[in-house]
Amino acid sequence: MNGQERNSISKGLQVDIVLKADQKTGKLTRGTVKDILTKSNFHPHGIKVRLEDGRIGRDQQIVST
């Protein structure tokens, strides 16, 4: 599942995100969603989320539901 639609993401899901610093390389960081930061229902580069550890990035893939 990709992370472009807000309704497919919820708190507690395990996701792979791309941090701002890793946008050029596309390196993925895995974590658990704490907050959903994007207000719109869709974003072509992924919904922006905050992980439990405080890191912020755009969701690229949902690992678990």
From Swiss-Prot:
Source organism (scientific name): Bacillus subtilis (strain 168)
Q: Which InterPro entries match?
A: DUF2196 (IPR019240)
Q: Which gene encodes it?
A: ywbE
State the superkingdom. Answer: Bacteria
Q: What is this protein's name?
A: Uncharacterized protein YwbE
